[in-house]
Amino acid sequence: MSSESFTISKKALITLIAASIVVIISLGIRQTFGLFYFDFNTDLDISISHFGFVMGLQLLLWGVFSPLFGVITDKYGGAVAIFIGFVFYLVGVLLFYSGYNTGGYFTLTIGVMIGIGLGSTAIGIPVSVVAKHFPASNRTIATGIVTCAGSFGYFVSPLLVRYSLVETGWENTLLYFSLLLGLGLVVALFVSTPKIPVGVNQDNNQTARDALKEA
């Protein structure tokens, strides 16, 4: 067993906690959209085919924008990338809540805006930033904690959202989402990226962009 302290600095601990909260909020909300379908179908006349297309588009954009946010993380830091992602996520939810929620607006808000937001807030960026704060001996544990936090969000959020849908309706539930995403904007500022990753020499500090060029 390594004799190194698991939390090597206060900044590492804060980043670990903040990144965990980020993925709980992001993945927790994303996991629950399927619960809204019957309300969307009844109140907004969203068909199952349109709903399925938008969810697929959301996943596609999540994947497309993840490496782009990786470049932003390399250049400006994880806090900036995650903050931008939460802005897209929050604007998508607020526009939908405000009435831009049928036809093409449904595709734009839930599919495009939230899909882009997931590119930096879901799991890849928070995990990669946390990994840079820990040496190889503790890195797996640290990133595992963030991944576990995402799983916790997956598990808990459907239970809470289902209760909220029954008791308060889908509009109020989306309003609660916007409050959580607003919290995410604040928490994102604490996901700091070290100038030199722990355990990496300055001469060997390779960015994602450098790795792509080398490949």
Tell what function each PLM region has.
Residues 87-101:
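C-terminal ends and interior cores of transmembrane alpha-helices
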Residues 14-48, 66-69:
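Extracytoplasmic
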Residues 120-134:
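Intracellular juxtamembrane helix-capping segments at the cytosolic ends
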Residues 65-77:
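Helix-to-loop junctions at the C-terminal end of transmembrane segments
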Residues 146-196:
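Helix-loop-helix hairpin linking two adjacent transmembrane segments in secondary transporters
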Residues 193-210:
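Flexible cytoplasmic inter-helical loops of multi-pass small-molecule transporters
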Residues 31, 59-67, 154-155:
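Residue-level signature of mid-helix packing/kink "hotspots" within the transmembrane helices
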Residues 104-121:
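Hydrophobic core of transmembrane alpha-helices in multi-pass small-molecule transporters
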